[in-house]
Design a protein with these regions (language model features):
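Active-site-proximal C-terminal subdomain of hydrolase catalytic domains
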Residues: 79-172
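Second-shell loop/turn segments in exported
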Residues: 4-13, 24-26, 50-57, 112-117, ...
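A short, glycine/acidic-enriched catalytic loop
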Residues: 32, 40-74
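Extracellular/periplasmic catalytic domains that process cell-envelope and extracellular macromolecules
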Residues: 28-32, 72-74, 93-97
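A cross-kingdom feature marking charged/low-complexity
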Residues: 168-193
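Structural recognition of the beta-strand scaffold that forms the well-ordered cores
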Residues: 2-6, 34-39, 77-83, 100-104
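Functional beta-strand-loop-alpha-helix junction segments that form "active/interaction loops"
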Residues: 1-33, 153, 157, 164
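A mature extracytoplasmic/lumenal domain signature
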Residues: 9, 41-43, 53-55, 84-86, ...
């Protein structure tokens, strides 16, 4: 089963409702699961994600508050992908042995492609639309995406964003195990359907 954490913020993440949502996800998931969180937004020099919405005044989400929000999931394997300027600054507060973190840029660099007209940022397209369609190895997919982002930025004459990766071996191994299980289940289902 898949469970989703939806957080609608009007206050800081220590708000009881938001922590309750993270706790609920922790309770519904087990050690066999992997929580995959994709965040895309504008990022700031102060390592905060903009979550502002039209007609709503929402506080930005600082890196340390995202880490606090994920604390109820500290015993779960997690992949956190952040596509935003300065997103490399999210790695230090998020990194641990059960959390893989991919970011679209170094802590001191902007990333590109964030606009209403685009389906993806440069990094999002390179990772999700391209690299993960070529390999299900997360570390390899990141390297492919990083190379493609660099090529596109060079072609556009932009300063390199230099995507970052924190990839603990236990998370990579758990991901591979889950992907093998999914492949086996798909093969079994296809065989039964014939």
């Amino acid at each position: 089963d898949r469970f989703y954490l939806e957080v609608q913020r009007t206050n800081r993440v220590n708000d009881e409702e938001h922590l309750h949502a993270a706790v609920a996800l922790a309770e519904r998931s087990g050690p066999e699961d992997l929580v995959f969180l994709y965040l895309t937004s504008h990022g700031s020099h102060d390592h905060e994600l903009s979550i502002d919405q039209p007609r709503l005044q929402l506080a930005d989400l600082p890196a340390d508050e995202l880490a606090a929000l994920l604390q109820p999931l500290r015993d779960r394997y997690k992949v956190v992908v952040i596509s935003a300027c300065y997103s490399g600054g999210f790695i230090p507060p998020l990194k641990d042995d059960k959390t893989l973190v991919m970011t679209a840029a170094r802590a001191d660099r902007v990333s590109f492609g964030c606009s209403e007209e685009n389906d993806f940022t440069y990094f999002g397209r390179a990772l999700f639309a391209e690299a993960l369609n070529e390999t299900d190895d997360l570390a390899r997919a990141f390297e492919l995406a990083k190379t493609r982002v660099a090529e596109r930025e060079q072609a556009d004459d932009f300063e390199p964003s230099e995507p970052q990766l924190w990839a603990p071996k236990p998370v990579l191994e758990h991901w591979k195990k889950l992907r093998r299980q999914q492949a086996e289940e798909a093969l079994s289902a296809a065989t039964k359907a014939q």
